[in-house]
Design a protein with these regions (language model features):
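Conserved beta-strand hairpin/beta-sheet module of binuclear metal-dependent hydrolase folds
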Residues: 1-45, 131-143
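Hydrophobic residues at beta-strand termini and immediately following loops
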Residues: 7, 109, 122
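Residues that act as N-cap/strand-start positions at coil-to-secondary-structure junctions
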Residues: 12, 101-103, 126
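Short, glycine/acidic-enriched loop or turn micro-motifs at the edges of active sites
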Residues: 22, 33, 59, 78, ...
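Active-site neighborhood of phospho(di)ester-bond hydrolases with catalytic His/Asp-centered motifs
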Residues: 28-30, 50-58, 72-75, 121-124, ...
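Active-site HxH/HxHxD metal-binding segment of metal-dependent hydrolases
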Residues: 33-112, 199-203
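Conserved N-terminal boundary motif of the eukaryotic protein kinase catalytic domain
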Residues: 116-118
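Metallo-beta-lactamase
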Residues: 121, 126-207
């Protein structure tokens, strides 16, 4: 398989399938509503899941936990969000929808054991938002922190605009310019292009 494969759910949230090694072990970035499609692809291609890394706890990025049997990592500041999708999903769909609470084990991504992965803490969209950098792939996965042409909302539960601005200046600036940035929604682009063309980055970044 290619090193990075994207799946997009009906909620427009992206799930990325990552192959950081020269073998059939793959890792997932986020577990959105279309996780069954991703699992089917993995099984059809005889791949082995090494684990999943969740950028933040919003339902459109974490509700797939209920169908996921492998090891999953999240910043524990967002554990409550990830475990309780019913608290969020009803507002999105217009009706109160009941979704079972996730009772499985969640691992603290800040204690991960993988040499190929760097984790950046970037609160703003949620308190526990993080980005994942795979240096060998030249890729960074930002969830709803940074998009190609925008940034994540800060008016939802545990969001904070001042923290978002701080994260842009203290975390986004650490990403290498030639790396490809893969967001939680929409298309990817290079970090330097986003730095130069994203109007929110241009406004908030203290050059």
């Amino acid at each position: 398989m290619t090193d990075i494969k994207k799946f997009t759910s009906f909620a427009t949230s992206n799930c990325y399938l990552i192959s950081p090694f020269d073998n059939e072990i793959v890792f997932l970035i986020d577990l959105p509503p279309n996780i069954d499609e991703v699992i089917d692809y993995i099984n059809t291609n005889n791949l082995t899941i090494g684990g999943a890394f969740i950028t933040h706890g919003h339902w459109d990025h974490a509700i797939g936990l209920s169908s996921f049997d492998s090891k999953a990592y999240i910043n524990l500041d967002d554990e409550h969000l990830a475990r309780n999708p019913s608290d969020q999903i009803g507002d999105f769909l217009g009706d109160k929808v009941s979704v079972n609470k996730y009772e499985g084990n969640l691992h603290n991504v800040l204690d991960h054991e993988y040499d190929f992965l760097n984790v950046y803490i970037n609160p703003g969209h949620t308190k526990g938002s993080v980005s994942f950098e795979f240096k060998d792939l030249g890729a960074v996965f930002t969830g709803d922190f940074i998009f190609k042409d925008s940034i994540g909302r800060t008016d939802l539960y545990s969001g904070d605009n001042n923290e978002m601005i701080d994260s842009i200046n203290n975390v986004f600036t650490l990403f290498q310019d030639d790396f490809q940035l893969f967001p939680g929604h929409g298309d990817d682009d290079t970090v330097i292009n986003i730095k130069n063309n994203n109007p929110f980055i241009r406004e908030y970044l203290k050059w």
